[in-house]
């Protein structure tokens, strides 16, 4: 019976991950609230790894949806050479820019991962960052602007590096990786659609690396998977994959006609809720 409920909780976690990883509303903020209600029977070490590795399902959704835009090779059926691969240089250049944008967060993330988890993974920090970034979205969208970059192929290395610098801030729980990079893209002159799509692509190496790091640390620390834990992880990843496809389609349709202001107000409201739950547990129920 415990396994059944753990799998059910994994489904809920997968839904939360699939929605909040791509919408700029902070997956961590929602996970903290979910953890107050969804109590797994697994170890704390497994759950720390589970919260991150479940992102693999979300990453796969981006790869599947945008494979043609991301695959840097084309196939030419030549008579003499047979099946020959040729580089699609516009796509390869996009990957170079993605790598440039990922470097700042990759370097600092590797160096500070444990320290950040120990000092910043708490309800107060998450609530403050939810509210701060919510205000930032509202203020940015109120500023009159004309996007100078509307296509991924027009993104410069300077813009990629600046977006990467903003992504560093996403190491702080509650900021939202997609929220940070979208804000960075908007401030660099990208359109909402361009900033959102670039954010999706940045997630592939960043989230794959973060998931791999957590998995290695779990195994290196003596962690051993039980059958129930493997099942929960697979279920969570599959659900995150399916829901991510729906969330990405929704966001790309949404930004064609709307601003990010609604997400800003939602973040502020969620931050207040997280702060309220923390205050209740700390001062009333303690």
Residue ranges and their predicted role:
Residues 1-286:
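Multi-pass membrane proteins that catalyze or facilitate reactions on polyprenyl-/lipid-phosphate substrates
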